[in-house]
Design a protein with these regions (language model features):
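ABC ATPase nucleotide-binding domains
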Residues: 51-53, 66-200
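Conserved coupling/switch loops of ABC nucleotide-binding domains, chiefly the family-specific signature
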Residues: 27-30, 179
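Non-catalytic connector elements of ABC transporters
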Residues: 208, 219-319
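The feature captures the beta-strand-to-loop junction immediately N-terminal to the Walker
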Residues: 6-8
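ABC ATPase NBD coupling module
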Residues: 38-54, 192
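Conserved ABC transporter NBD signature motif
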Residues: 29-40
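Short beta-strand immediately N-terminal to the Walker A/P-loop
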Residues: 3-4, 54
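Helix-to-loop junction immediately C-terminal to a conserved catalytic motif
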Residues: 21
């Protein structure tokens, strides 16, 4: 399994990894790995006896050793040569085995470091922001290679990241931390994205359009339309979150079924168009709204559009 710790900078994600690895001592509580207590206020099993692999942000490859020598360094009499050869084959660097780390690209160094961390067959592998130093195009390639390698290795993994989409791509279970280091919600990527428990979790997976108001008659009136609310929120002050992809637009000179919006800007972002809209609230004051539409949707500035809401991309919480 691949479990992710997702949270903002300063929330204690890396510190937790160090505690699990035995690089720091716990001040309270316990850490249990495979049924064995490895850390408590009265016990501290040394790092080298925990059978844990650790991939650091800077990779920590030995600069004086070749790729092959780096990979073979963690092995001992208990490790079969076939396991080493299998891992070497998986990293797809047949022509680089005799090179030194400084002769490799960032992505190649990352693959070698990952392979070295799993070649000794650890019970648990810890990854600390493993893709943060890579540029966007290389990050996607290396992330895909990493997932493939981890699945092939059949090792349990805990990965730390502040990138929600990276967490969704590579893990099958996510724990969301708040700034204090508390776990706010845990679950599969699908659960957390589609069933967030509060505004914090909702916002962690990207920008949302937010509107506040009071529920009346099982509905709340927003600048982008009337939204049905759960029955248990009647009379409550609530905040409505609508993801940009939940704001659907039609090119209409006048609204037919929805609410009128005016296009302030339309920007092609590659796979989608980012539309910046202005709408009027109940007090005739301008409110700004963001929409993500298919790339071919590119309305002119100042043009009128019709707004409709996708309820599946709408989330309502007590304020």
């Amino acid at each position: 399994s691949i479990s992710c710790i997702l949270g903002p900078s300063g929330s204690g994600k890396t510190t937790l990894l160090k505690l699990i690895a035995g690089l720091e001592k716990v001040q309270s509580g316990k850490i249990i790995i495979n049924g064995e207590e490895v850390s408590s206020t009265s016990k501290h099993l040394p790092t080298e006896k925990r059978k844990i692999g650790f991939l650091f942000q800077d990779y920590a490859l030995f600069p004086h050793l070749t790729v092959k020598e780096n990979l073979k360094f963690p092995t001992n009499a208990k490790n079969s040569t076939s396991n080493v050869d299998e891992i070497i084959e998986l990293i797809k660097l047949p022509n680089s085995l005799d090179k030194y780390p400084h002769e490799l690209s960032g992505g190649e160094q990352q693959r070698v470091a990952l392979a070295r961390s799993i070649i000794s067959q650890p019970n648990l592998l810890l990854l600390d922001e493993p893709f943060s130093s890579l540029d966007l195009s290389l990050r996607e390639e290396v992330r895909d290679d990493t997932l493939h390698l981890l699945q092939k290795s059949n090792v349990s993994v805990i990965i730390v990241t502040h990138d929600p989409f990276e967490a969704m791509f590579i893990s099958n279970h996510i724990n969301i931390f708040d700034k204090s280091g508390s776990i706010i919600q845990s679950g599969t990527p699908n659960d957390l994205y589609n069933n967030p428990k509060n505004s914090y979790v909702t916002g962690f997976f990207g920008e949302t359009n937010q509107f506040k108001g009071v529920v009346k008659g099982s509905h709340i009136i927003t600048p982008v339309g009337k939204i049905k609310t759960p029955e248990n929120l009647e009379g409550e002050n609530v905040v409505v979150h609508i993801r940009p992809q939940g704001i659907k637009l039609n090119k209409q000179p006048t609204p037919v079924n929805g609410i009128k919006g005016t296009v302030m800007a339309s920007k092609l972002m590659g796979s989608f168009s980012f539309i910046h809209l202005s709408v009027l609230d109940n007090n005739n004051e301008i409110v700004h709204v963001h929409s993500h539409m298919p790339a071919e949707f590119n309305p002119k500035q100042s043009s009128a559009v019709e707004i409709e809401i996708d309820n599946d991309q709408t989330y309502i919480f007590k304020n």
